[in-house]
Amino acid sequence: MRVGILTFPGSNCDHDCYHVVKHVMGAEAQYVWHKDRLPEQLDAVVVPGGFSYGDYLRCGALARFSPVIADLVTFAEKGGPVLGICNGFQILCEAGLLPGVLMRNASLKYICKDVTIRVEGQETPVTRGLAGQSLTMPIAHAEGNYFADPETLDRLEGEGRVVFRYVGGAPNGSARDIAGISGGPARNVVGLMPHPDRASESILGLEEGKRMFAALLG
């Protein structure tokens, strides 16, 4: 299993994702610079967190125009597994791979804390065998308030594409307590604001995010 880790100017969680995939899970991982083509031999792609392009204009808005995004869209449309974490979720929304947008937190403050999310909806590449489970992992964002129009929210709910929901209410004001959603032809594109990459080793105090990487790597 070979996983590509996209890297943009301002990414800072690409190393975390690389470490988990390669050193914790024992799979092959390679960085993919935003100006390069997506290697054809990849089995999955992770769009990591960080502050791509310094979050100028809007989170993910500039990264959406990076050359690698066209290849990412093609990869996703062919059913390739794509996981977007935090800023990666924002980028996937800006690129049109997932519906909706991530707005400023309702508190207008940066939030960094552990949260518990519940796995819901239909199975995806990162939630195989995890339905109904609660996972605890950190969030660290200022723009994690998921918003979509009521029709889109109803469609996501009806199609089972609300993949993760905050337990006890969304700390950022996210609509319907949504923490993550899926898209793509086979629910193969998943975006979420919490960081499974920061909850995959005992030394960090949390290992429940490791279950998501185990599902992704099959």
UniProtKB/Swiss-Prot annotation:
E.C. no: 6.3.5.3, 3.5.1.2
Q: Which residues form a coiled coil?
A: none
Alphabetical list of HAMAP family matching this protein: PurQ
Q: Describe its partners and assembly state.
A: Part of the FGAM synthase complex composed of 1 PurL, 1 PurQ and 2 PurS subunits.
The UniProt function text for this chain reads:
Part of the phosphoribosylformylglycinamidine synthase complex involved in the purines biosynthetic pathway. Catalyzes the ATP-dependent conversion of formylglycinamide ribonucleotide (FGAR) and glutamine to yield formylglycinamidine ribonucleotide (FGAM) and glutamate. The FGAM synthase complex is composed of three subunits. PurQ produces an ammonia molecule by converting glutamine to glutamate. PurL transfers the ammonia molecule to FGAR to form FGAM in an ATP-dependent manner.
In terms of SUPFAM superfamilies, this protein maps to:
Class I glutamine amidotransferase-like (SSF52317)
InterPro entries noted in UniProt: Class_I_gatase-like, PRibForGlyAmidine_synth_PurQ
| Sorted UniProt keywords | ATP-binding, Cytoplasm, Glutamine amidotransferase, Hydrolase, Ligase, Nucleotide-binding, Purine biosynthesis
Q: Which GO terms describe its molecular function?
A: ATP binding; glutaminase activity; phosphoribosylformylglycinamidine synthase activity
Q: Where is it chiefly localized? A: cytoplasm
Per the record, its GO cellular-component terms are: cytoplasm
Gene Ontology biological process terms, A to Z: 'de novo' IMP biosynthetic process
Pfam families with a match to the protein in the record:
GATase_5
Q: Which gene encodes it?
A: purQ
By its UniProt entry, which PROSITE patterns does this protein fall under?
GATASE_TYPE_1 (PS51273)
What species does this protein belong to?
Anaeromyxobacter dehalogenans (strain 2CP-C)
Pathways involved: Purine metabolism; IMP biosynthesis via de novo pathway; 5-amino-1-(5-phospho-D-ribosyl)imidazole from N(2)-formyl-N(1)-(5-phospho-D-ribosyl)glycinamide: step 1/2
- Return the SMART domains for the record: GATase_5
Q: List localization entries.
A: Cytoplasm
Residues of the Glutamine amidotransferase type-1 domain: 2-218
- Protein name as annotated: Phosphoribosylformylglycinamidine synthase subunit PurQ
Q: Which reaction does it catalyse?
A: N(2)-formyl-N(1)-(5-phospho-beta-D-ribosyl)glycinamide + L-glutamine + ATP + H2O = 2-formamido-N(1)-(5-O-phospho-beta-D-ribosyl)acetamidine + L-glutamate + ADP + phosphate + H(+); L-glutamine + H2O = L-glutamate + NH4(+)
Q: Where is the active site?
A: 86 (nucleophile), 195
